[in-house]
Amino acid sequence: MALIESYMLPLGTQSPSFSLPNVINNQIKELEIIRGKNGTLIIFMCNHCPYVIHLLEGIIKTAIDFSKKGIATVAISSNSIKTHPQDGPKEMKKLALLKRFSFPYLYDKSQEVAKNFQAACTPDFYLFYNQRKLYYKVRYDDS
């Protein structure tokens, strides 16, 4: 598997807005409504990625820990179901329910949101503080 380097939005960049369906309950979620009072962690991830699979329990725990600090977590999958059918909304919902995600899992069918964030691989993490300015962009760990 090839390592794909992430692109870096400049720190301080305003978070792009988005409005995407939550696969868990089919509700449209907008960043303005779901962001946390102290910040928002946006994770680009997908079901089939071995790095996501490896980190998933840690991601779930981080989301719970962050919520206690007023930081919302949002996961977004932008993979094409033509090339990765296991990353489609039905499979995303199964995973979210099985793992009891405490955060919305959104589907970016057009991949427009991923492009706006310059997300190039999974998982990609973007931490925005409360004014929606990029504070931190990095991989979860060295794995």
Give the location of each predicted region.
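Chalcogenol-based redox active-site neighborhoods
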Residues: M1-S143
